[in-house]
Protein backbone atom coordinates (compact mmCIF):
# COMPACT_ATOMS: atom_id res chain seq x y z
CA UNK A 1 0.00 0.00 0.00
CA UNK A 2 1.37 3.42 -0.92
CA UNK A 3 1.23 5.10 2.55
CA UNK A 4 3.20 2.19 4.05
CA UNK A 5 5.80 2.51 1.32
CA UNK A 6 5.96 6.26 1.80
CA UNK A 7 6.54 6.11 5.53
CA UNK A 8 8.91 3.16 5.55
CA UNK A 9 12.25 4.86 6.01
CA UNK A 10 14.00 8.19 6.07
CA UNK A 11 15.98 9.20 3.00
CA UNK A 12 19.70 9.71 2.98
CA UNK A 13 20.14 13.40 3.68
CA UNK A 14 21.91 15.65 1.21
CA UNK A 15 25.00 17.41 2.53
CA UNK A 16 23.97 20.54 4.41
CA UNK A 17 26.29 23.26 5.65
CA UNK A 18 26.98 23.09 9.38
CA UNK A 19 25.23 26.37 9.99
CA UNK A 20 22.02 25.24 8.30
CA UNK A 21 20.36 23.52 11.28
CA UNK A 22 20.86 26.54 13.44
CA UNK A 23 19.59 28.87 10.76
CA UNK A 24 16.62 26.64 10.13
CA UNK A 25 15.96 25.80 13.72
CA UNK A 26 15.70 29.11 15.51
CA UNK A 27 12.93 30.95 13.60
CA UNK A 28 10.80 27.84 13.16
CA UNK A 29 11.30 26.73 16.75
CA UNK A 30 10.32 30.14 18.09
CA UNK A 31 7.11 30.20 16.04
CA UNK A 32 6.35 26.60 17.03
CA UNK A 33 6.83 27.42 20.72
CA UNK A 34 4.58 30.47 20.47
CA UNK A 35 1.95 28.48 18.57
CA UNK A 36 2.05 25.64 21.09
CA UNK A 37 1.31 27.90 24.05
CA UNK A 38 -1.26 30.00 22.19
CA UNK A 39 -3.23 26.96 21.03
CA UNK A 40 -3.27 25.08 24.32
CA UNK A 41 -2.63 27.19 27.42
CA UNK A 42 -3.82 30.29 25.55
CA UNK A 43 -7.10 28.61 24.68
CA UNK A 44 -7.58 27.49 28.28
CA UNK A 45 -6.96 30.96 29.74
CA UNK A 46 -9.07 32.74 27.10
CA UNK A 47 -11.97 30.39 27.74
CA UNK A 48 -11.59 30.87 31.48
CA UNK A 49 -11.88 34.65 31.12
CA UNK A 50 -14.81 34.15 28.77
CA UNK A 51 -16.59 31.76 31.12
CA UNK A 52 -16.13 34.09 34.08
CA UNK A 53 -17.60 36.99 32.11
CA UNK A 54 -14.39 39.02 32.29
CA UNK A 55 -14.16 39.46 28.50
CA UNK A 56 -16.41 39.23 25.46
CA UNK A 57 -15.88 36.62 22.75
CA UNK A 58 -13.66 38.90 20.68
CA UNK A 59 -12.00 35.86 19.09
CA UNK A 60 -15.10 33.69 18.98
CA UNK A 61 -14.27 30.28 20.38
CA UNK A 62 -10.58 31.19 19.93
CA UNK A 63 -9.05 28.01 18.50
CA UNK A 64 -10.11 28.38 14.86
CA UNK A 65 -9.24 32.09 14.68
CA UNK A 66 -5.82 31.66 16.27
CA UNK A 67 -5.06 28.60 14.13
CA UNK A 68 -5.79 30.60 10.98
CA UNK A 69 -3.56 33.44 12.19
CA UNK A 70 -0.74 31.00 12.94
CA UNK A 71 -0.95 29.21 9.60
CA UNK A 72 1.14 31.72 7.56
CA UNK A 73 4.18 31.81 9.89
CA UNK A 74 4.08 28.05 10.46
CA UNK A 75 3.76 27.38 6.73
CA UNK A 76 6.57 29.80 5.91
CA UNK A 77 8.86 28.27 8.53
CA UNK A 78 8.11 24.80 7.15
CA UNK A 79 8.86 25.90 3.57
CA UNK A 80 12.05 27.61 4.76
CA UNK A 81 13.24 24.34 6.25
CA UNK A 82 12.53 22.59 2.96
CA UNK A 83 14.56 25.23 1.13
CA UNK A 84 17.53 24.72 3.44
CA UNK A 85 17.30 20.99 2.74
CA UNK A 86 17.04 21.55 -1.01
CA UNK A 87 13.37 20.60 -0.97
CA UNK A 88 14.14 17.05 0.09
CA UNK A 89 10.87 16.01 1.70
CA UNK A 90 11.13 13.45 4.48
CA UNK A 91 9.05 10.36 3.77
CA UNK A 92 7.02 10.77 6.94
CA UNK A 93 6.13 14.28 5.82
CA UNK A 94 5.28 13.06 2.34
CA UNK A 95 2.93 10.37 3.63
CA UNK A 96 1.16 12.74 6.01
CA UNK A 97 0.82 15.53 3.44
CA UNK A 98 -0.51 13.02 0.91
CA UNK A 99 -3.20 12.01 3.40
CA UNK A 100 -4.12 15.66 3.99
CA UNK A 101 -4.26 16.25 0.23
CA UNK A 102 -6.58 13.27 -0.21
CA UNK A 103 -8.75 14.51 2.66
CA UNK A 104 -8.92 17.97 1.05
CA UNK A 105 -9.88 16.51 -2.35
CA UNK A 106 -12.71 14.52 -0.75
CA UNK A 107 -14.00 17.68 0.94
CA UNK A 108 -13.81 19.70 -2.28
CA UNK A 109 -15.53 17.04 -4.40
CA UNK A 110 -18.41 16.67 -1.94
CA UNK A 111 -18.76 20.28 -0.77
CA UNK A 112 -21.49 21.30 -3.27
CA UNK A 113 -23.91 18.67 -1.96
CA UNK A 114 -22.73 18.22 1.64
CA UNK A 115 -23.88 19.90 4.82
CA UNK A 116 -21.84 23.15 4.92
CA UNK A 117 -21.33 22.82 8.68
CA UNK A 118 -19.73 19.39 8.25
CA UNK A 119 -17.54 20.52 5.35
CA UNK A 120 -16.40 23.59 7.32
CA UNK A 121 -15.61 21.38 10.30
CA UNK A 122 -13.47 19.15 8.09
CA UNK A 123 -11.65 22.10 6.51
CA UNK A 124 -10.71 23.28 9.99
CA UNK A 125 -9.67 19.71 10.76
CA UNK A 126 -7.16 19.81 7.90
CA UNK A 127 -5.85 23.13 9.23
CA UNK A 128 -5.46 21.80 12.78
CA UNK A 129 -3.75 18.61 11.60
CA UNK A 130 -1.20 20.54 9.55
CA UNK A 131 -0.49 23.14 12.22
CA UNK A 132 0.02 20.53 14.94
CA UNK A 133 2.25 18.47 12.66
CA UNK A 134 4.53 21.46 11.99
CA UNK A 135 4.58 22.47 15.67
CA UNK A 136 5.52 19.03 16.96
CA UNK A 137 8.04 18.42 14.19
CA UNK A 138 9.74 21.77 14.78
CA UNK A 139 9.57 22.65 18.47
CA UNK A 140 12.59 22.09 20.69
CA UNK A 141 10.96 20.50 23.73
CA UNK A 142 14.22 20.35 25.66
CA UNK A 143 14.78 24.10 25.95
CA UNK A 144 14.82 25.21 29.57
CA UNK A 145 12.57 28.21 28.89
CA UNK A 146 9.99 26.01 27.20
CA UNK A 147 9.97 23.42 29.98
CA UNK A 148 9.63 26.00 32.77
CA UNK A 149 6.83 27.79 30.92
CA UNK A 150 5.12 24.46 30.31
CA UNK A 151 5.23 23.48 33.98
CA UNK A 152 3.98 26.92 35.04
CA UNK A 153 1.08 26.78 32.59
CA UNK A 154 0.07 23.31 33.78
CA UNK A 155 0.11 24.50 37.39
CA UNK A 156 -2.00 27.55 36.47
CA UNK A 157 -4.54 25.47 34.53
CA UNK A 158 -4.88 23.01 37.42
CA UNK A 159 -5.34 25.89 39.86
CA UNK A 160 -8.19 27.25 37.71
CA UNK A 161 -9.90 23.87 37.58
CA UNK A 162 -9.67 23.41 41.34
CA UNK A 163 -10.69 26.99 42.13
CA UNK A 164 -13.82 27.10 39.97
CA UNK A 165 -15.11 23.55 40.34
CA UNK A 166 -18.58 23.11 41.84
CA UNK A 167 -19.59 19.86 43.53
CA UNK A 168 -16.58 18.05 42.11
CA UNK A 169 -16.99 19.22 38.51
CA UNK A 170 -15.42 22.02 36.48
CA UNK A 171 -17.80 23.55 33.94
CA UNK A 172 -17.60 27.31 33.55
CA UNK A 173 -20.71 27.56 31.39
CA UNK A 174 -22.76 26.40 34.38
CA UNK A 175 -21.72 29.49 36.35
CA UNK A 176 -23.93 31.65 34.14
CA UNK A 177 -21.42 34.51 34.21
CA UNK A 178 -20.40 34.46 30.54
CA UNK A 179 -21.54 37.39 28.42
CA UNK A 180 -21.27 35.22 25.28
CA UNK A 181 -22.27 31.78 26.60
CA UNK A 182 -22.44 30.18 23.14
CA UNK A 183 -18.69 30.69 22.75
CA UNK A 184 -17.71 29.02 26.04
CA UNK A 185 -15.96 25.70 25.47
CA UNK A 186 -17.22 22.40 26.80
CA UNK A 187 -15.17 20.13 29.07
CA UNK A 188 -13.70 18.55 25.91
CA UNK A 189 -11.97 21.75 24.83
CA UNK A 190 -10.55 22.36 28.30
CA UNK A 191 -9.39 18.76 28.66
CA UNK A 192 -7.63 18.77 25.28
CA UNK A 193 -5.81 21.98 26.19
CA UNK A 194 -4.59 20.35 29.39
CA UNK A 195 -3.84 16.80 28.27
CA UNK A 196 -1.57 17.64 25.33
CA UNK A 197 0.82 19.89 27.32
CA UNK A 198 0.77 17.35 30.14
CA UNK A 199 1.74 14.54 27.77
CA UNK A 200 4.61 16.66 26.44
CA UNK A 201 5.80 17.47 29.96
CA UNK A 202 5.70 13.82 31.01
CA UNK A 203 7.60 12.58 27.97
CA UNK A 204 10.30 15.24 28.31
CA UNK A 205 10.83 14.94 32.08
CA UNK A 206 13.66 12.54 32.97
CA UNK A 207 13.21 12.94 36.74
CA UNK A 208 10.88 10.22 37.98
CA UNK A 209 9.80 12.18 41.06
CA UNK A 210 8.69 15.09 38.87
CA UNK A 211 6.75 12.78 36.55
CA UNK A 212 4.89 11.30 39.51
CA UNK A 213 4.19 14.80 40.79
CA UNK A 214 2.69 15.59 37.38
CA UNK A 215 0.57 12.43 37.56
CA UNK A 216 -0.62 13.56 40.97
CA UNK A 217 -1.55 16.94 39.53
CA UNK A 218 -2.99 15.76 36.23
CA UNK A 219 -5.27 12.96 37.40
CA UNK A 220 -7.41 15.07 39.77
CA UNK A 221 -7.45 17.94 37.26
CA UNK A 222 -8.83 15.78 34.45
CA UNK A 223 -11.14 13.98 36.86
CA UNK A 224 -12.72 17.24 38.03
CA UNK A 225 -12.85 18.41 34.42
CA UNK A 226 -15.16 15.38 33.85
CA UNK A 227 -13.34 14.41 30.65
CA UNK A 228 -13.64 10.64 30.73
CA UNK A 229 -11.68 9.88 27.56
CA UNK A 230 -8.81 12.19 28.47
CA UNK A 231 -8.76 10.89 32.04
CA UNK A 232 -8.56 7.36 30.65
CA UNK A 233 -5.81 8.46 28.27
CA UNK A 234 -3.70 9.72 31.18
CA UNK A 235 -4.24 6.45 33.05
CA UNK A 236 -2.99 4.71 29.91
CA UNK A 237 0.07 6.98 29.63
CA UNK A 238 1.32 6.28 33.15
CA UNK A 239 2.31 2.61 32.61
CA UNK A 240 3.33 3.33 29.00
CA UNK A 241 5.83 6.01 30.06
CA UNK A 242 7.07 4.40 33.27
CA UNK A 243 7.64 1.00 31.68
CA UNK A 244 9.63 2.58 28.86
CA UNK A 245 11.65 4.82 31.19
CA UNK A 246 12.55 1.98 33.57
CA UNK A 247 16.02 0.45 33.37
CA UNK A 248 14.77 -2.80 34.87
CA UNK A 249 11.58 -3.37 32.94
CA UNK A 250 10.52 -6.62 34.59
CA UNK A 251 10.78 -4.98 38.01
CA UNK A 252 8.75 -2.00 36.80
CA UNK A 253 6.15 -4.34 35.31
CA UNK A 254 5.84 -6.05 38.69
CA UNK A 255 5.45 -2.68 40.43
CA UNK A 256 2.77 -1.54 37.97
CA UNK A 257 0.84 -4.80 38.36
CA UNK A 258 1.05 -4.49 42.14
CA UNK A 259 -0.25 -0.91 41.97
CA UNK A 260 -3.11 -2.03 39.74
CA UNK A 261 -4.03 -4.83 42.14
CA UNK A 262 -3.87 -2.43 45.10
CA UNK A 263 -6.06 0.06 43.28
CA UNK A 264 -8.60 -2.60 42.41
CA UNK A 265 -8.76 -3.88 45.99
CA UNK A 266 -9.35 -0.38 47.36
CA UNK A 267 -11.51 0.95 44.53
CA UNK A 268 -14.69 1.21 46.60
CA UNK A 269 -12.93 3.19 49.33
CA UNK A 270 -11.33 5.50 46.76
CA UNK A 271 -14.65 6.16 45.02
CA UNK A 272 -16.31 6.90 48.35
CA UNK A 273 -13.59 9.41 49.24
CA UNK A 274 -13.72 11.51 46.06
CA UNK A 275 -16.52 13.77 44.79
CA UNK A 276 -18.84 12.06 42.36
CA UNK A 277 -19.15 13.21 38.75
CA UNK A 278 -19.60 11.75 35.26
CA UNK A 279 -15.98 10.53 35.14
CA UNK A 280 -17.02 7.66 37.41
CA UNK A 281 -19.12 6.33 34.54
CA UNK A 282 -15.86 4.78 33.31
CA UNK A 283 -16.38 2.13 35.98
CA UNK A 284 -19.69 1.11 34.44
CA UNK A 285 -20.17 2.28 30.88
CA UNK A 286 -23.46 0.40 30.60
CA UNK A 287 -24.96 3.13 32.80
CA UNK A 288 -23.56 5.95 30.64
CA UNK A 289 -25.99 7.65 28.27
CA UNK A 290 -23.03 9.04 26.34
CA UNK A 291 -21.55 5.57 25.84
CA UNK A 292 -24.93 4.28 24.68
CA UNK A 293 -25.20 7.11 22.15
CA UNK A 294 -21.70 6.41 20.85
CA UNK A 295 -22.58 2.75 20.45
CA UNK A 296 -25.61 3.70 18.37
CA UNK A 297 -23.50 6.03 16.22
CA UNK A 298 -20.99 3.21 15.67
CA UNK A 299 -23.79 0.90 14.53
CA UNK A 300 -24.99 3.63 12.18
CA UNK A 301 -21.47 3.99 10.77
CA UNK A 302 -21.20 0.23 10.22
CA UNK A 303 -24.51 0.32 8.37
CA UNK A 304 -23.25 3.14 6.13
CA UNK A 305 -20.01 1.25 5.48
CA UNK A 306 -21.96 -1.87 4.53
CA UNK A 307 -23.93 0.15 1.98
CA UNK A 308 -20.91 2.08 0.65
CA UNK A 309 -17.83 -0.07 1.38
CA UNK A 310 -15.44 1.47 -1.16
CA UNK A 311 -16.11 5.20 -1.37
CA UNK A 312 -17.98 5.68 1.89
CA UNK A 313 -20.79 8.23 2.08
CA UNK A 314 -19.36 11.63 2.91
CA UNK A 315 -21.32 13.71 5.45
CA UNK A 316 -24.25 11.30 5.35
CA UNK A 317 -25.09 11.97 9.01
CA UNK A 318 -26.58 14.97 10.83
CA UNK A 319 -24.04 17.51 12.07
CA UNK A 320 -22.12 16.19 15.09
CA UNK A 321 -23.64 12.70 14.89
CA UNK A 322 -20.61 10.96 13.41
CA UNK A 323 -19.04 7.76 14.74
CA UNK A 324 -16.84 8.71 17.68
CA UNK A 325 -14.01 6.42 16.63
CA UNK A 326 -11.78 5.68 13.66
CA UNK A 327 -14.69 4.22 11.66
CA UNK A 328 -15.64 7.83 10.96
CA UNK A 329 -12.72 7.84 8.48
CA UNK A 330 -14.28 4.99 6.48
CA UNK A 331 -17.64 6.76 6.36
CA UNK A 332 -16.24 10.08 5.14
CA UNK A 333 -13.05 9.10 3.28
CA UNK A 334 -13.91 5.62 2.04
CA UNK A 335 -11.86 2.46 2.32
CA UNK A 336 -8.66 4.04 0.96
CA UNK A 337 -8.74 6.93 3.41
CA UNK A 338 -9.48 4.59 6.32
CA UNK A 339 -6.65 2.22 5.34
CA UNK A 340 -4.23 5.12 4.83
CA UNK A 341 -4.97 6.49 8.28
CA UNK A 342 -4.46 3.06 9.84
CA UNK A 343 -1.08 2.71 8.14
CA UNK A 344 -0.05 6.23 9.15
CA UNK A 345 -0.64 5.35 12.80
CA UNK A 346 0.15 1.64 13.06
CA UNK A 347 3.34 1.49 11.01
CA UNK A 348 5.18 4.01 13.23
CA UNK A 349 3.99 2.24 16.37
CA UNK A 350 5.19 -1.17 15.16
CA UNK A 351 8.48 0.29 13.99
CA UNK A 352 9.09 2.10 17.29
CA UNK A 353 8.21 -1.00 19.30
CA UNK A 354 10.83 -2.94 17.33
CA UNK A 355 13.40 -0.18 17.83
CA UNK A 356 12.86 -0.04 21.58
CA UNK A 357 12.01 -3.55 22.70
CA UNK A 358 13.56 -5.86 20.09
CA UNK A 359 16.57 -4.07 18.62
CA UNK A 360 17.27 -1.93 21.69
CA UNK A 361 18.33 1.02 19.57
CA UNK A 362 20.10 3.77 21.41
CA UNK A 363 17.89 6.54 20.01
CA UNK A 364 14.84 4.86 21.56
CA UNK A 365 16.00 6.04 25.01
CA UNK A 366 15.64 9.75 24.27
CA UNK A 367 12.83 12.20 24.88
CA UNK A 368 12.07 12.49 21.15
CA UNK A 369 11.25 8.78 21.03
CA UNK A 370 9.18 8.81 24.21
CA UNK A 371 7.17 11.83 23.09
CA UNK A 372 6.31 10.24 19.75
CA UNK A 373 5.62 6.86 21.37
CA UNK A 374 3.34 8.42 24.00
CA UNK A 375 1.40 10.58 21.55
CA UNK A 376 0.94 7.75 19.05
CA UNK A 377 -0.27 5.38 21.76
CA UNK A 378 -2.61 7.96 23.26
CA UNK A 379 -3.97 8.94 19.85
CA UNK A 380 -4.63 5.32 18.88
CA UNK A 381 -6.44 4.75 22.19
CA UNK A 382 -8.62 7.84 21.80
CA UNK A 383 -9.47 6.94 18.19
CA UNK A 384 -10.75 3.62 19.50
CA UNK A 385 -12.64 5.15 22.42
CA UNK A 386 -14.16 8.47 21.45
CA UNK A 387 -12.31 10.68 18.97
CA UNK A 388 -12.97 11.08 15.25
CA UNK A 389 -10.61 10.68 12.32
CA UNK A 390 -9.70 14.37 11.92
CA UNK A 391 -8.60 14.69 15.54
CA UNK A 392 -5.71 17.16 15.74
CA UNK A 393 -3.77 14.74 17.97
CA UNK A 394 -2.99 12.74 14.83
CA UNK A 395 -1.01 15.69 13.49
CA UNK A 396 0.79 16.13 16.81
CA UNK A 397 1.68 12.43 17.05
CA UNK A 398 2.97 12.18 13.48
CA UNK A 399 4.88 15.44 13.83
CA UNK A 400 6.62 14.07 16.92
CA UNK A 401 7.31 10.82 15.04
CA UNK A 402 8.79 12.74 12.09
CA UNK A 403 11.06 14.58 14.52
CA UNK A 404 12.21 11.30 16.06
CA UNK A 405 12.83 9.70 12.65
CA UNK A 406 14.93 12.64 11.53
CA UNK A 407 17.41 11.91 14.31
CA UNK A 408 17.70 15.65 14.82
CA UNK A 409 16.27 17.74 17.62
CA UNK A 410 15.39 20.43 15.07
CA UNK A 411 13.95 18.28 12.32
Predicted regions and their residues:
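Hydrophobic transmembrane alpha-helices and their immediate junctions
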Residues: 26, 30, 87, 335-379, ...
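Flexible juxtamembrane loops connecting transmembrane helices in multi-pass membrane enzymes
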Residues: 57, 264-296, 315-317
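Hydrophobic alpha-helical membrane-interfacial segments at the cytosolic entry of transmembrane helices
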Residues: 95-98, 151-159, 247-268
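TM-adjacent membrane-interface loops and short helices in multi-pass inner/ER membrane proteins
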Residues: 286-323, 333-340
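N-terminal signal-anchor transmembrane segment
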Residues: 2-81, 102-110, 160-166, 378, ...
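Membrane-interface helix-loop-helix junctions at transmembrane boundaries of multi-pass membrane enzymes
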Residues: 26, 78-94, 203-213, 245-251, ...
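Alpha-helical transmembrane segments of multi-pass inner-membrane proteins
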Residues: 142-172, 185-244, 347
Amino acid sequence: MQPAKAIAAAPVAMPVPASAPAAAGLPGAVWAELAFFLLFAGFFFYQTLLGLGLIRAYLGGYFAVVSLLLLPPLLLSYVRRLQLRRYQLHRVDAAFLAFLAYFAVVIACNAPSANPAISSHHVLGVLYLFNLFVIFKTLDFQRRRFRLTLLASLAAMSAIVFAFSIDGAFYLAALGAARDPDSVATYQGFSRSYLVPLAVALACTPQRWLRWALYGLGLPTLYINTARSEFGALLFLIPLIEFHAARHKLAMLAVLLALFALLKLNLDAIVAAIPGNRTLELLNLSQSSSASMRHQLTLQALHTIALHPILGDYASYPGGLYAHNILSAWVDLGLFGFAALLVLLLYPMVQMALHAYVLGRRDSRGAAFLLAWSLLGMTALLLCMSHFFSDMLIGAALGAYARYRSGDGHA
